[in-house]
């Protein structure tokens, strides 16, 4: 990934991943940052980690020192028997709030608007400036959400467009069409589409 980032400089932003709890995970992560990767991506359902563990604290500290953001799938859904752990035991907005309090200098993004605790995560972005959410899948009608997500209810400077492309069960542009059709201002649309991501990943926007 770091080689791709160098090859396509200013066009590709690469993320690192490690397995929390593996030997020297923080050292591996530091090497990834030194190679040019711009943040850490984790998925609690797949990697089966407790975000409040000492193993994670070492990774948080590495990100803090290097001023790198974290994209962390810690919403409880989608739950699957294919996972080796129970997401409902590992994931919650309440558990994340402890991380936000203990590491206020780290930017953290939770995908899927934190589904299925979207209301709790919406409240958290009002309370903590170091939390972002992304829209992946939840502004379509794919997930069984009661009522349509209204982006006007959210803090517009803390929501990012997300897609999960190419691993999605619908057309690649479906979420983009939903976003474009949303009843939001042009300012909010620009923030959600790209400006908030540039802020989160510390990407310098190039003049068009």
Question: Across the structure, where does each feature detected by a protein language model lie?
Answer:
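Conserved, mostly hydrophobic/aromatic
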Residues: 1, 5, 32, 40, ...
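Active-site gating/metal-coordination segments in enzymes
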Residues: 1-79, 207
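Mid-to-C-terminal alpha-helical segments outside catalytic/metal-binding sites
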Residues: 30-31, 155-158, 169-208
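Alpha-helical elements of Rossmann-like donor-binding domains used by nucleotide-donor carbohydrate transfer enzymes
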Residues: 3, 27, 31, 58, ...
């Amino acid at each position: 990934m770091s080689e791709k980032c160098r090859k396509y400089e200013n066009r590709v932003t690469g993320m690192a991943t490690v397995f929390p709890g593996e030997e020297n995970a923080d050292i591996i992560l530091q090497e990834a940052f030194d190679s040019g990767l711009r943040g850490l991506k984790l998925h609690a359902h797949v990697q089966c980690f407790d975000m409040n563990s000492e193993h994670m604290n070492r990774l948080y500290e590495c990100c803090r020192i290097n001023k790198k953001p974290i994209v962390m799938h810690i919403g409880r859904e989608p739950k699957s028997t294919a996972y080796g752990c129970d997401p409902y035991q590992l994931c919650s907005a309440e558990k994340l709030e402890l991380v936000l309090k203990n590491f206020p200098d780290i930017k953290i993004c939770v995908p899927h608007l934190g589904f299925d605790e979207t209301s709790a995560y919406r409240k958290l972005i009002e309370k903590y400036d170091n939390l972002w959410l992304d829209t992946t899948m939840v502004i379509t009608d794919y997930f069984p959400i009661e009522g349509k997500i209204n982006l006007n209810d959210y803090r517009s400077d803390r929501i990012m467009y997300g897609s999960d492309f190419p691993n999605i069960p619908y057309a690649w542009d479906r979420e983009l069409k939903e976003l474009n059709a949303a009843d939001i201002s042009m300012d909010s649309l620009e923030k959600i589409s790209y400006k908030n991501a540039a802020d989160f990943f510390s990407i310098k926007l190039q003049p068009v």
